[in-house]
Amino acid sequence: MSYNLTDPYEIARYIKEAKKSTPIKAYIEGDLSNCDFTNIEKFNSGDLYILFGESEEILVIIEKNKDKIKNCRIEQDRRKSAIPLLDMLKINARIEPGATIRDKVIIGENAVIMMGAVVNIGAEIGEGTMVDMNAVVGARGKLGKNVHLGAGAVVAGVLEPPSSDPCTIEDNVLIGANAVILEGIKIGKGSVVAAGSIVTTDVPENVVVAGAPAKIIKEVDVKTKDKTKLLDDLRK
């Protein structure tokens, strides 16, 4: 079944209809030689087993063979998850440990996703853009090229409340730490959003905004550009 992931209601339907998954990894010491491992990925040497699969299938094996099991340890990082995580092996970008990126996103060349950052379904991260520590890019949020999304900043998504227009951050924008860009807002090219600002209306190109709600305080000048320049070495 196909879904139009530009529509928040279609995204919600996709999540609703997706098969929910609770994958686990089990380390087992015992005799499981007579078990049926259909649909389970198994690695073993002698009485040592590592099993990857859905919890309901692995837990059945453990319960039925508990008298043959000496030791068991289970690792789990999600429950009834609807959307898988992105296969990062296919991405030519720097993605640090602890970043959470859902499937069906676009990550541009030489982008940087830092520890603790969250990128939700349908989001687009442009070439050379950095999503700093603990920043959030909500569903369908669009970040252009060479954007810096500061630590703890939020680009709101389209899901709750539903919004037909995603947040759009154009090229060469700098968003300071802990700033919040509300649903459907557009930030024009080259603009700067000061740390801690709450942006409730569209921002034109090449201006600096600050405050809650954010207001234009000046145009971007040479001094501003020098203070907010990006470091190419971080994107190599």
Swiss-Prot record:
Its EC number is 2.3.1.89. One of its GO terms (molecular function) is tetrahydrodipicolinate N-acetyltransferase activity. Gene3D superfamilies: Hexapeptide repeat proteins, Malonyl-CoA ACP transacylase, ACP-binding. The keyword Ribosomal protein does not apply. GO terms for biological process: diaminopimelate biosynthetic process; lysine biosynthetic process via diaminopimelate. Disulfide bonds: none annotated. This is 2,3,4,5-tetrahydropyridine-2,6-dicarboxylate N-acetyltransferase. It comes from Clostridium botulinum (strain Kyoto / Type A2). The lineage of its organism: Bacteria, Bacillati, Bacillota, Clostridia, Eubacteriales. The gene is dapH.
